[in-house]
Design a protein with these regions (language model features):
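Register position in tetratricopeptide repeats
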Residues: 49, 83, 117, 150-152
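A conserved position within tetratricopeptide repeats
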Residues: 10-11, 26-29, 64, 98, ...
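TPR-adjacent "capping" and linker segments in tetratricopeptide-repeat scaffold/adaptor proteins
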Residues: 1, 26-39, 155
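TPR-repeat structural position
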Residues: 15-18, 53, 87, 121
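Alpha-helical adaptor scaffolds
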Residues: 34-106
Length: 156
């Protein structure tokens, strides 16, 4: 399955096919084309899983410095910074990811979560809508959109 085919399947009516397509996309997005860089990505992911956020951040920064065009390096550093509750920095990293891969539903949703945490509900709602335009079956984005819209109503 090509990336284009996977993105098309995400938008289809078959939920199981969309889930498979999402998995295919994540696999594609985790491959840089260079085994050494893929090893750095894996090293950073393992540091995140150990909750070694400084180590993960350092590893992803090395990856970004060596392969600035590799969107997933930026996305993973965004995740680390979100986990560290540095939402402004995570937003900047999500933007870098999206500049390289505009269909990265993980970065779209992640940026939306950052705006939600900052109380920027309109921005969050917009990002969750954009996420759902790419991946309509992503339940967390649907739930987070409802939350953002509910908060907007409370403010008005």
């Amino acid at each position: 399955m090509t990336e284009r085919e996977a993105l098309t399947a995400l938008r289809g009516d078959d939920v199981a096919q969309a889930a498979r397509a999402a998995g295919v996309l994540w696999q594609m997005w985790h491959r840089s084309g260079d085994p050494r860089l893929d090893g750095l990505l894996q090293e950073g992911i393992e540091a995140m899983q150990r909750e070694d956020l400084p180590g993960a951040d350092t590893t992803f920064t090395r990856l970004i410095n060596e392969a600035p065009a590799f969107a997933e390096g930026w996305n993973k550093r965004a995740t680390v910074r979100y986990m560290a509750q540095d939402y402004a920095a995570a937003i900047a990293e999500c933007r870098e990811t999206l500049a390289r891969n505009p269909n990265h539903f993980g970065a779209l949703s992640g940026q939306g979560l950052c705006h939600l945490m900052l109380g920027q509900f309109s921005e969050a709602a917009d990002l969750f809508r954009r996420t759902l335009a790419v991946h309509p079956h992503l339940g967390s984005a649907r739930d987070n959109l409802r939350t953002a819209l509910s908060e907007i109503v409370k403010l008005n």
